[in-house]
């Protein structure tokens, strides 16, 4: 699946989680039609952050289904993700959706892939979309070699991705969740 026009990155630290996404929407392969789209959003009583990449209508379909699963399972991020993935694999309509999501709460970061997989990165760093490899490399380097906050890491990682990827811009939406004391 070729995901163009978006980069989403998430970083988990001891203090919490930050998720960032750029605002560019690209039509086809060359025309940027919007620069301030919100691809990172809060849900479930502001305790979960989701970022999505891929076809917009498909992403919103998954967003709505994921929100329903969170409600059904009392905000349990992992359970809601696994149950959505099961539906994603079983449902012929859902299997054709071209979207990916990063979902996070204060202690977890998960990637929900376009094939219905649930992936928890070992180091708490995840990235999807066209600039994902650049953002992930930058985030890992910053996490390992600096004392920056999760928010600062995702902001700097997205800036680097925007320099490298023509389908990513510097109009960021960043959401953070702190671990309870």
UniProtKB/Swiss-Prot annotation:
Na(+) binds at residues 162, 165, 168. The keyword Cytoplasm applies. Keywords: Allosteric enzyme, Cytoplasm, Hydrolase, Metal-binding, Protease, Sodium, Threonine protease. GO terms for molecular function: metal ion binding; threonine-type endopeptidase activity. InterPro entries: ATP-dep_Prtase_HsIV_su, Ntn_hydrolases_N, Proteasome_sua/b, Proteasome_suB-type. Allosterically activated by HslU binding. It catalyses: ATP-dependent cleavage of peptide bonds with broad specificity. It is found in: Cytoplasm. GO terms for cellular component: HslUV protease complex; proteasome core complex. The active site is at residue 6. It comes from the Bacteria. Its main location: cytoplasm. CDD domains: protease_HslV. Pfam families: Proteasome. SUPFAM superfamilies: N-terminal nucleophile aminohydrolases (Ntn hydrolases). The keyword DNA damage does not apply. Its EC number is 3.4.25.2. A double ring-shaped homohexamer of HslV is capped on each side by a ring-shaped HslU homohexamer. The assembly of the HslU/HslV complex is dependent on binding of ATP. Belongs to the peptidase T1B family. HslV subfamily. This is ATP-dependent protease subunit HslV. It comes from Solidesulfovibrio magneticus (strain ATCC 700980 / DSM 13731 / RS-1). The lineage of its organism: Bacteria, Pseudomonadati, Thermodesulfobacteriota, Desulfovibrionia, Desulfovibrionales. The gene is hslV.
